[in-house]
Amino acid sequence: MCGEVRYEVSEPFVSANYCHCTRCQRRTGTGASANGRTAEGSFRIVKGEEFVKCWDPGGGGFPKCFCSNCGSALYSQSPDGGQIAVRLGTVDGNPGIRPEKRQFTAYAAVWEPIPDDGLPRFPESSRVQ
């Protein structure tokens, strides 16, 4: 990140996962996005709120928020409220959690094979299975 946006998470992440959906691939330029979930009330922008832009992809996707200065993907907002999915790569230091599952593996990038790391795999969202 360029440093224009700073945030804090006041409570520990409640879960973390790798998302292999094509939206995450396109938004991050990677084969999977590592996300930590936290309660919406525990996430707060402390600097540069004017640089945070959010885009709603529609079609059931979560609104994606990013830094308008450097383009870094920062977090997603659950459409039903309640949770924020923070991109773990934007956390300063140790986020205190490691991804414990992989979701949307049916859409995994052919150019980046999913590692054999023993994590549970879900072809679609892990929340509906």
Which residues are covered by each model-predicted region?
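A short Gly-Trp-Pro
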Residues: 1-129
